[in-house]
Amino acid sequence: GTIGKRVASAVSAQDDMEVVGVTKTRPSFESEVARYRGFDLYTPQKSIELFEKANVPVGGTVEDLCGKVDIMVDCTPGNVGPEYKAVYAKAGIKAIFQGGEDHSLTGISFNSTANYKESWGAQFSRVVSCNTTGLLRTLYPIDRQFGIEKAYVTLVRRAADPGDSKSGPINGLEPTVKLPTHHGPDVQSIMPWVNINTMAIKASTTIMHMHTVTLELKNPASTEAAVEAIRNSSRVRMVDSASGIKSTAEIMELSRDLARDRSDMYEIVVWEDGVKAAGNTLYYYQAVHQESDVVPENVDCIRSMCKVCDAADSVKMTNQALGIPYRC
């Protein structure tokens, strides 16, 4: 899927990791692409016949793959995790789940910057969603420097991924009427001390999410100091509208021009000229590439759970392998 294929590519780019195989439930074009990229395919037992009829060779079942790996990165759709967690537990292997699952599935949620150590040596962990990852990348450094009294965030969410022809709306704005949205509690699974409220709207776009953030700070900040706090955070890219980046469209054009794999923008993009501090209140906009921002977090989570190295070293290695400018 969207995240799984990217994680497989990112892991294969690391010097200290090996992708043993990837799983698919049906012999789609993505299965062929996975084989083209050199990945061995595995599938649930019930899908073996489908692959045989399509003449797509597989290396075995999901259970077979579990017997060959140290850790599984589970990128199945939300709410499927409990079923596969039982499979991984029976096999005695570690597993990482994604933000579509509840925090309660693992009891640990992961972010490279904010709580890398919490997953150290764990059998199961969960990388939070794309939007939550985006919020943590900027909220954490601001909280460390100024303290956050309260956070108010409105998320303008893409309606569907670019490769999704089934979701919508395609001509409208759809509010999430159940409030607050899940994003605030998800942030609190990693930063439980932050008082945060979130609202969300789905918009007729496919390429990125947009956040408008208003923070009440414990200590006053200047605009310049706030910009520096955000700029110095790893996996945040500052842009300026005067350079021509006025929307998410230009951000994705920038990513294509950087020749990233699949044109991915792993960093959270913040408009420097859209950051404004007024006493204890801070305002800013940020854009989130929902297809890719969690990918480097999954790589770092592997190292934490396998007790490979500390957070700074892992982030540096991951960033170098993926072409992300590194900041301490």
Please identify what each model-predicted range represents:
Residues 1-164, 312-318, 323-326:
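N-terminal Rossmann-like NAD(P) cofactor-binding subdomain of oxidoreductases
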Residues 8, 136-143, 184-188, 224-227, ...:
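Predominant activation on well-ordered alpha-helical scaffold segments within soluble catalytic domains
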Residues 263-328:
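NAD(P)-dependent Rossmann-like dehydrogenase/reductase catalytic/cofactor-binding core
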Residues 2-62, 66, 147-150, 154-286:
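C-terminal substrate-binding/catalytic lobe of Rossmann-fold NAD(P)-dependent oxidoreductases
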Residues 81-83, 247, 291:
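Intrinsic-disorder/low-complexity, polar/charged segments
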